[in-house]
Amino acid sequence: LYNALYGSDVISETDDASRGNKYNPERGKKVIEYARNFLDENIPLFKSSWKDISEVPKVYNGKLSLKLKDEKQFVGYSGTLNGLSSLLLKKNNLHIGIIFDPDNKLEVFNPEGNQDKAKVHDIILESAITAIIDHEDSVAAVDAEDKVLGYKNWLGLMKGNLQTEFEKGGKKIIRKLNPDRIYTKSEKKGEPNFNEIKFHGRALMLNRNVGHLMTNSSILLKDGSEIPEGILDAFITVTAAIHDFKSKGNSRTNSGYIVKPKMHGPDEAAFTDLIFEHVENESVR
């Protein structure tokens, strides 16, 4: 949340809070203030405010040292009891993670170090439950070269090793898939203490194939004509998804998830069913 707020127009650039080419502490203050207001609105404290917190909270006997207005919003934590590295909270069954950095070990863009008085490094929000990876023809994958790149990226997502590097502010940044997040459960009546819980660090990914009417020059048939692109998509994207079955990094049920657009009536829907029947039969061989 901190990085997203800092780099967007959600935070005004007035009052010396411009984004600029280097880290601006005044803008950083506005980011922290916005985040505290967000927590006060969604995870309110009992007769207090997140703005008043000046140290990393602790957990005693499975219970949080901070008194929440609704204690059921405390889900779990990671780190040691006296040195939390994160808190897991929830609102409307969507989770909010607060990451702490009491020893200033995590990298920040501020040359002076973490300016958050409670040593909050970041706030992580549970986002969309699903994400569509688009292989459709209109924009995402127009020609054969686009298609191959799209398949390569999808394979990397299914293997869990896709990453990219770029420069920001003179520093090399690596973006890669988030690992699963491990927490210790908060104490609740009827449950043993210190049960471990795991949350997927990534949204569930679905692949949007093309509709039936398109062809693609990435594979040519014996007569020189282009392959029906929807059939190609079905076999390649599902085959790549098999890599995920062992790790369960995406599917919890050893499944591949396909979005099939632009079906014009029952005949085309039946043809889709026939395609995926063949895909499943070939995949289990």
For each predicted feature, which ranges?
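Catalytic alpha/beta active-site cores
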Residues: 1-271, 277-284
